[in-house]
Amino acid sequence: MIDGTCLDIPDSDENARVFGRPGSRTGTRSAFPKVRLVILVEAGTHLIFDALMCPYKMGERVRALKLLRSVTPGMLLMWDRGLHSYAMVEATFSKGCEYLGRIPSNVKFLNETQLDDGSYLSWIYPSGKLRKKGFKPIQVRVIEYIIEHSERPEAQIRYRLITSLLEAEKFPAQLLACEYHQRWEVENTIDELKVHLLARKTHIRSQRPCIGGTRNLWFTTRTEELYGH
């Protein structure tokens, strides 16, 4: 699973210059600079396979693509809708790794071939322009379902997933939907990282971003592997 989070770092000029700090609607600055951390985590063990840090304003997608250096054939990579992109699908596909990711609500897929389990086959393109120009797409399978709240029927959440596992007979939609919700294990890993291991005013101690901060953050993720076990 790939996901990201933001961590507070000490309020030094160097940290603020390298990593930045969020603003607010009122124009005030955050009390501390922040670093963005993107991690590749194994669902069952919470093992952190790989991690990258970047400035707060840099999007997770850029770093997530670099984390694909650590995926291998036979893995099933899961991601949330914020990481959905043609580039992510293409890069994962090129690594020989299967994927299962959530689709943003504003992204549409045509039902090209209806499958018996309710899912359907479609195609993903880099952009609408390239689609019109006949750019070769990647075939995907789309799974749609709704999760209902047992006590609040009106509180429904609609999910749409995209996957490289095209065979409904081998990989039924219900099985993949249940599998996807293991993605929340990455939230538990982040909780362990931030709350249990980094329970201090700022998550990273170092005042120097390029040396101490990187080393401190990497040591923390390695420690989390031991803690998670």
Question: Would you name each region that the model predicts?
Answer:
Residues 2-229:
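Single, function-defining residue in the core of a domain
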